Amino acid sequence: MLSMQASFFFPTGPFILFVFTASTIFHLQQRMVKIQPTWELQMVTQVTTESPSSPQLKGMWTINAIGRLGNQMGEYATLYALARMNGRPAFIPPEMHSTLAPIFRITLPVLHASTARRIPWQNYHLNDWMEERYRHIPGEYVRLTGYPCSWTFYHHLRTEILREFTLHNHVREEAQDFLRGLRVNGSRPSTYVGVHVRRGDYVHVMPNVWKGVVADRRYLEQALDWFRARYRSPVFVVSSNGMAWCRENINASRGDVVFAGNGIEGSPAKDFALLTQCNHTVMTIGTFGIWAAYLAGGETIYLANYTLPDSPFLKLFKPEAAFLPEWIGIEADLSPLLKH
C-alpha cells in the first residue's frame, strides 16, 4: 500500500512553478499579438517617410483642362513630365479626371475645385514644344496653361506615359473582340491598320483661319496603298468624326476597309481603343490621331505640310515637335488654297 501511494505522489512546489511560468508566457504572447500591428505600422511609417525615392516635396503643380480627349492627353502627359523634371508633385483638375479616367488607368491625384480655389496659383504658359527654360520653372504653386501636345515634353518617359494611358480591361477587350471578328475576303487579316480621319470643324477652320487643308481622297488612297504594298492582307479600320464623307471617299471595293468608328466626339473611347489596338496607323491631322499613333506604335503615315508657308498656325505648331522622326509624311495637296 505504501509503495502504491508513493508512486502517485507529485510534489506541489514544482507544479505551481510550472503553472505560473506557462501562464506568464501565454499572457506575454497575447500581449505581443495585440501590439504587433502598432510595431508594424511604426516600421511602415518610418520606411515611407525616410525613403529617399519618395521625398515630401513642397508645392503643387496642375494644368488647365481644355479641349477634347487628344488635347487633355497632351496636357496630362506634359504635366506628368514637367512636374517630374522640376521636382514638384502633380495634380489634375476634376474635369480632366472625368475625361481620362473612364478610359485609362491614370495615376495622378485629383485636385478638387474647393482646394484649388484657395491656392495662390502662378500661371505659366507653355508653347506646343519643349524648351530649355521649362526645365527650371519657378514657383511652388504653378498652373501650366496652353495646349501642349508634343512628344518633346515626355518622350524620354515613354514607358511611363504608355503605362498611364493603358486602357481599362473592358475598353481594350471590347476593341480586341471587334478586331478579331474582322475578315478580308473571308480570311483573317495579318495586319491591322487604324485610320483616323479628322473632319468636323477642321473642314472650315483650316482653310478659313489657318490657311490649311484637311486630308483629301488622294492622300488617303496613297496612305492605304503604302501599307498594301508592304503587308499581306492588311485590314484598314476607319474611325472619323465625318464617317459619311469617309464612306463616299475611301474606296472599300477591295474588301479590306471597315468603317468601324461611331464618330461621336462626346464619347470617343470606342474609336480611340480600336485605333490603339491596331498594329499601324494612318492619321490625318489633330491630337486624337497623334495620340492613337503614339499608343499603337508600329508604322505611322501622317499628312505633312498641310498649311501654306505664311500660315499663322505655324507660329503655334511645329510639325517636327508633333510628329515623331520615324513617322512618314505624305505631302498635302495645297492647290485648293492657291485658287483663292
Swiss-Prot record:
Catalytic activity: a beta-D-galactosyl-(1->3)-N-acetyl-beta-D-glucosaminyl derivative + GDP-beta-L-fucose = an alpha-L-Fuc-(1->2)-beta-D-Gal-(1->3)-beta-D-GlcNAc derivative + GDP + H(+); a beta-D-galactosyl-(1->4)-N-acetyl-beta-D-glucosaminyl derivative + GDP-beta-L-fucose = an alpha-L-Fuc-(1->2)-beta-D-Gal-(1->4)-beta-D-GlcNAc derivative + GDP + H(+); a neolactoside nLc4Cer + GDP-beta-L-fucose = a neolactoside IV(2)-alpha-Fuc-nLc4Cer + GDP + H(+); a neolactoside nLc4Cer(d18:1(4E)) + GDP-beta-L-fucose = a neolactoside IV(2)-alpha-Fuc-nLc4Cer(d18:1(4E)) + GDP + H(+)
Residues bearing glycans: N185, N251, N279, N305
This protein's pathway: Protein modification; protein glycosylation
Membrane-topology descriptor: Single-pass type II membrane protein
Topology feature Lumenal, residues: 29-340
Cited function: Catalyzes the transfer of L-fucose, from a guanosine diphosphate-beta-L-fucose, to the terminal galactose on both O- and N-linked glycans chains of cell surface glycoproteins and glycolipids and the resulting epitope regulates several processes such as cell-cell interaction including host-microbe interaction, cell surface expression and cell proliferation. Preferentially fucosylates gangliosides GA1 and GM1 in the antrum, cecum and colon and in the female reproductive organs.
Protein name: Galactoside alpha-(1,2)-fucosyltransferase 2
Organism annotation: Sus scrofa (Pig)
Highest classification ranks of the organism: Eukaryota, Metazoa, Chordata, Craniata, Vertebrata
